[in-house]
Amino acid sequence: MPQLVPFYFMNLLTGGILAISLLLYFVATYLLPNILRLLIARNIIIKL
């Protein structure tokens, strides 16, 4: 198991942090604004 070998630990940690950061950036810039826009539009339509 490479997770337990100290030589690979920093590589796995760096890759994990990088992957989570990219995923968080993608979700925050593309997915959340579209979902928020959809929810606001639905609320406006319901209130009409």
From Swiss-Prot:
Location in the cell: Mitochondrion membrane
Entry keywords, A to Z: ATP synthesis, CF(0), Hydrogen ion transport, Ion transport, Membrane, Mitochondrion, Transmembrane, Transmembrane helix, Transport
InterPro entries noted in UniProt: ATP_synth_su8_fun (IPR009230)
Entry GO CC: mitochondrial membrane; proton-transporting ATP synthase complex
GO BP, one annotated term: proton motive force-driven ATP synthesis
Main location: mitochondrion
Keyword rRNA-binding: no
Record's keyword annotation contains Transmembrane helix: yes
Pfam family name, one: Fun_ATP-synt_8
Transmembrane segments: 12-32
Any GO MF annotation of the entry: proton transmembrane transporter activity
Topological type in the membrane: Single-pass membrane protein
Family: Belongs to the ATPase protein 8 family.
Subunit (UniProt): F-type ATPases have 2 components, CF(1) - the catalytic core - and CF(0) - the membrane proton channel.
Function of the molecule: Mitochondrial membrane ATP synthase (F(1)F(0) ATP synthase or Complex V) produces ATP from ADP in the presence of a proton gradient across the membrane which is generated by electron transport complexes of the respiratory chain. F-type ATPases consist of two structural domains, F(1) - containing the extramembraneous catalytic core and F(0) - containing the membrane proton channel, linked together by a central stalk and a peripheral stalk. During catalysis, ATP synthesis in the catalytic domain of F(1) is coupled via a rotary mechanism of the central stalk subunits to proton translocation.
Protein's name in the database: ATP synthase protein 8
Organism: Candida parapsilosis
